[in-house]
């Protein structure tokens, strides 16, 4: 059994492994609030396009 088949031996349906950024498919630093599901790096790039405004 190869390493790849052991690593992906079952589908991820819950937890951090099940969620990824909808822009770049990155798994760390996800912003899930309001159903965004975007990593923080992509959020900084796309925040103005989405409609978020920095107040300070």
From Swiss-Prot:
Co-factor note (free text): Binds 1 zinc ion per subunit.
Membrane as UniProt keyword: no
Residues the record lists as binding Zn(2+): 21, 24, 39, 42
GO cellular component assignments: cytosolic small ribosomal subunit
Keywords recorded for this protein, A-Z: Metal-binding, Ribonucleoprotein, Ribosomal protein, Zinc
Molecular-function GO term, any one: structural constituent of ribosome
GO BP terms in the entry: cytoplasmic translation
Gene3D superfamilies given in the database record: 30s Ribosomal Protein S14, Chain N
Cofactor(s) it depends on: Zn(2+)
Homology family: Belongs to the universal ribosomal protein uS14 family.
Name this polypeptide is given: Small ribosomal subunit protein uS14
């Amino acid at each position: 059994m190869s390493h790849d088949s052991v690593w992906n031996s079952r589908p991820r349906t819950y937890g951090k492994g099940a969620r990824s950024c909808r822009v770049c498919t990155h798994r760390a630093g996800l912003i899930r609030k309001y159903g965004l599901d975007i990593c923080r790096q992509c959020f900084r790039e796309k925040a103005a396009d989405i409609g978020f405004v920095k107040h300070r």
